């Protein structure tokens, strides 16, 4: 993964009265310190590199000297303020050249010799070197980081000439090292001498190291302004496979009020990571959120607008501090993730044993080897503490991506007649990852207890596809016409199959079935239908049971949150 997302190096170049200068690069070329050691070891041009691809990636730009990099990366003034991207062989340079607009007129009013005191730097460029085949989303993210650093440096330069001071220090150290190299036997890299003495150089090194490890960059330029950045490719990944940022954004846009926010760390540690000037609303969301509380309830408890809770939840998810789940209730069905480690002595097993001393992780995961609802773990004779511990264990496993939640989807499946053997494209059922479950099994018709999500009947006036309008009661002509209009979108054999069901003789059942018909394409799970239509779970399950001859029930992950349920490695 690091081959495609980690930068090769970070480079700072400037252009001014002294020409184009490479102020700093990291990792710097340590091989320059002892060039003789490289020539004393004959090596075949066909020999295999013993250090592997990682060393090649580290030195991907090593063939470019400092002078060459300063020439090609210090752009013209006309290119400042926009994205800079240059590809040379297998290296791609990405930056955001920035022009330093100094008020020379103001300097001349207060200084009798403005020519001597005028700033010598005209522009600078913070450049990240990447592999040429890097994903475009990675390129855009690193350009965004370069732009943020450049904006802060430009601000500090205007405020206190911070960049000019650091550049003068770097150039003085480079001259000093160059003089030492002339007196000694060979050249030395000046950057290892610059690093301990220059705060800006240490910040750039920290940014590079963070990008190569966690993907989260937090800098305090000039110990004053903060630069925060998240490389989503490093934070969101599943089973050694990258999750594209576009998939994360699509899932975040599909968040609904019936979803819940699950923090991936405890409240205390998460609050300690927040910046001092963070939003008070974010703190309230973190303190109020719960795995058994949906976002609408969270907004009410935190006294915030639902839209603001959506934005804060998306912010936490993007930064890898939380994931979106469905609120925990006894009707939830979970199965062990195919990527979960079942080793007896794995690090996760040791953590689980410390957290829950009376249980071991492999035994608990074995209970979820097949899809199982949480209601099956409940016992009327068990103490309340046992149910609390069960919730804590499920939350712990969800945080580590060890469990996958399965939802119930319904597909209309009416057998075609001989006269019409071909189905329309819209009638093809959604392919389920888990096989269909018969409605006659207890698991499919679990009505739940009064404390279950059967009582979750929230209204959602903002839903576009909501059709829970008030209908006239009784078997009136208006009801018949509305039912016929709803069934008109079906093919002839589908209408005939539905009307042949005994439950279709009941006008109320037929009208409810027709009203929910657009949900029976395998794209809306049971909980979404409950929320959109303000309907109880028991009502829907009874309807599915009555029309089971033309319906197929399947269980699989919710595509909206499936991207968050994969195992982190």
UniProtKB/Swiss-Prot annotation:
Record keywords, A-Z: GTPase activation, Lysosome, Membrane, Phosphoprotein
GO molecular function terms noted in the UniProt entry: GTPase activator activity
Disruption phenotype: Lethality towards the end of gestation caused by a range of cardiac defects, including outflow tract abnormalities and ventricular-septal defects.
GO biological process, one term: roof of mouth development
InterPro entries xref list: Galactose-bd-like_sf, HTH_NPRL3, Npr3
Pfam family, one: NPR3
Family: Belongs to the NPR3 family.
Record-given protein name: GATOR1 complex protein NPRL3
Species name: Mus musculus (Mouse)
Name of the gene this protein is made from: Nprl3
């Amino acid at each position: 993964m690091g081959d495609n997302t980690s930068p090769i190096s970070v480079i700072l170049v400037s252009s001014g009265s002294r020409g184009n200068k490479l102020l700093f690069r990291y990792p710097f070329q340590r091989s320059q310190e002892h060039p003789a050691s490289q020539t004393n070891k004959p090596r075949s041009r066909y020999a295999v590199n013993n250090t592997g691809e990682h060393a090649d990636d580290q030195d991907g730009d090593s063939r470019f000297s400092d002078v060459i990099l300063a020439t090609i990366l210090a752009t013209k003034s006309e290119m400042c303020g926009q994205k800079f991207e240059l590809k040379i062989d297998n290296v791609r340079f990405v930056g955001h050249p920035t022009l330093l607009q100094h008020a020379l007129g103001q300097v001349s009013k207060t200084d009798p010799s403005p020519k001597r005191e005028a700033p010598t730097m005209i522009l600078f460029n913070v450049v990240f070197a990447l592999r040429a085949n890097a994903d475009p989303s990675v390129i855009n993210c690193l350009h965004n980081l370069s732009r943020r650093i450049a904006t802060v440096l430009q601000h500090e330069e205007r405020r206190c000439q911070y960049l000019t001071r650091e550049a003068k220090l770097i150039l003085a150290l480079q001259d000093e090292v160059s003089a030492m190299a002339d007196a000694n036997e060979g050249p030395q890299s000046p950057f290892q001498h610059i690093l301990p003495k220059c705060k800006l150089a240490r910040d750039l090194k920290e940014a590079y190291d963070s990008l190569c490890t966690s993907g989260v960059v937090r800098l305090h330029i000039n110990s004053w302004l903060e630069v925060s950045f998240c490389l989503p490719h490093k934070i969101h990944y599943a089973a050694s496979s990258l999750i594209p940022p576009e998939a994360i954004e699509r899932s975040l846009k599909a968040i609904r009020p019936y979803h819940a926010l699950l923090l991936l760390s405890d409240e205390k540690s998460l609050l300690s990571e927040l910046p001092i000037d963070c939003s008070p609303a974010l703190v309230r969301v973190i303190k109020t959120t719960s795995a058994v509380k949906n976002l609408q309830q969270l907004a009410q408890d935190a006294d915030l607008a639902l839209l603001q809770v959506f934005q804060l939840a998306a912010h936490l998810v993007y930064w890898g501090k939380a994931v979106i789940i469905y609120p925990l209730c006894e009707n939830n069905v979970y199965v062990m993730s195919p990527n979960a480690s079942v080793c007896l002595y794995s690090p996760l097993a040791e953590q689980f044993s410390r957290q829950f001393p009376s249980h071991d992780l492999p035994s608990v995961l074995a209970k979820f080897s097949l899809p199982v609802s949480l209601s099956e773990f409940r016992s009327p004779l068990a103490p309340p503490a046992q149910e609390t511990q069960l919730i804590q264990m499920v939350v712990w496993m969800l945080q580590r991506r060890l469990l996958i939640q399965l939802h119930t989807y319904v597909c209309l499946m009416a057998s075609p007649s001989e006269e019409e053997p071909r189905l329309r494209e819209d009638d093809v059922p959604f392919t389920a990852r888990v096989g269909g479950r018969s409605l006659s099994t207890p698991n499919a018709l679990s009505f739940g207890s009064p404390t279950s999500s059967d009582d979750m009947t929230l209204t959602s006036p903002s839903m576009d596809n909501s059709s829970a309008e008030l209908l006239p009661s009784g078997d009136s002509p208006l009801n018949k016409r509305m039912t016929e209009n709803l069934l008109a979108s079906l093919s002839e054999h589908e209408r005939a199959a539905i009307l042949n069901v005994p439950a279709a003789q009941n006008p109320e059942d037929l009208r409810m079935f027709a009203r929910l018909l657009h949900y029976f394409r395998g794209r809306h799970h049971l909980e979404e239908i409950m929320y959109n239509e303000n309907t109880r779970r028991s009502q829907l399950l009874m309807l599915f049971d009555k029309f089971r001859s033309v319906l197929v029930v399947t269980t699989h992950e919710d595509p909206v949150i499936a991207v968050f349920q994969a195992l982190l490695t």
